Regions:
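A short, proline-enriched helix->beta-strand linker immediately N-terminal to the Walker B motif
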Residues: 170-174
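Conserved ABC transporter NBD signature motif
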Residues: 64-75
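Short, glycine/charged-rich "phosphate-handling" switch motifs in NTP-dependent
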Residues: 224, 236
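Conserved ABC ATPase "signature" region
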Residues: 75, 127-146
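A short, surface-exposed alpha-helical micro-motif characterized by mixed small hydrophobic
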Residues: 218-220
């Protein structure tokens, strides 16, 4: 059995701008093994977040995606929407950079995470709430019961980001996609979250694909680094090899 958890081959993403198509991701071929971390490193606008959203099939309708993407040997682009919903948020989860848009402003934060858990498991409401409390403690949210009853706008940016991370981890995904996951956090919490990712990798063999512009973050967590610029992968290899060249 292959140890590759996700693989893309010649993946392209084009957007219709007025009367022409603009290529944001250009023939990207990458793979990630189980229990490893691949960091896509690049400046803003390089296409790294677009690539990740293409994997999750959440690009706008104006986008055209070509190429192949496999998750645990299954073709992501040929799955029905129902089949893909069973994977998204469950076996494959994403931490979004914009925590405010990732949470529904009309519902309490705890309720949203509880419902995510119950949609993908047989846990009771009480069991799901207990799971959320545990996750809030793990990601450094104080007074977890109180915070569960807060609406997104009642939390600081850093606190919301931690809640979004808890939501992504709530169903024990085997693949975590992370879009600048620690940008809104102070240095202490950032280190705590990155250490949590490493612990989950060790205990659950969770794979992480992360995009960032922060070389320090990449050096701390990555097994492999891919350098992206203008929608193209310029270099990909072991962390030390890439950073020392």
């Amino acid at each position: 059995m292959s140890d590759i958890i996700v693989k893309t081959t010649e993946l392209c993403a084009d957007f219709k701008i007025k009367d022409r198509m603009v290529r944001a991701v250009n023939r990207v071929s990458l793979s990630l093994e189980r229990g490893k971390t691949l960091v896509i490193l690049g400046e803003s606008g390089s296409g790294k977040s677009t690539y990740m959203k293409a994997l999750l099939r959440i690009l706008p309708k104006t986008a055209a995606v070509e190429g192949q993407a496999e998750f645990l040997g299954n073709d992501l682009f040929r799955m029905s929407e129902k089949e893909f919903r069973d994977i998204r948020g469950n076996r494959m989860a994403m931490i979004y950079q914009d925590s405010l848009s990732a949470l529904d402003p009309m519902y309490k934060v705890g309720y949203q995470i509880v419902e995510t858990i119950r949609a993908h498991s047989s846990l009771t409401k009480a069991e799901a709430r207990e799971r959320v409390e545990e996750l809030f403690v793990k990601v450094g949210i104080p007074s977890p019961r109180e915070r569960m009853n807060a609406y997104p706008h009642e939390m600081s940016g850093g606190m919301r980001q931690r809640a979004v991370i808890a939501m992504a981890l709530c169903c024990n995904p085997c693949l975590l996609l992370a879009d600048e996951p620690t940008t809104a956090l102070d240095v202490t919490i950032q280190k705590q979250i990155l250490n949590l990712f490493l612990e989950l990798q060790e205990s659950d063999r969770m794979s992480i694909m992360m995009v960032t512009h922060d070389i320090g973050v990449a050096a701390q967590v990555a097994d492999q680094i891919a350098i992206m610029y203008g929608g193209i992968i310029l270099e990909c290899g072991a962390t030390r090899q890439v950073l020392e060249t």
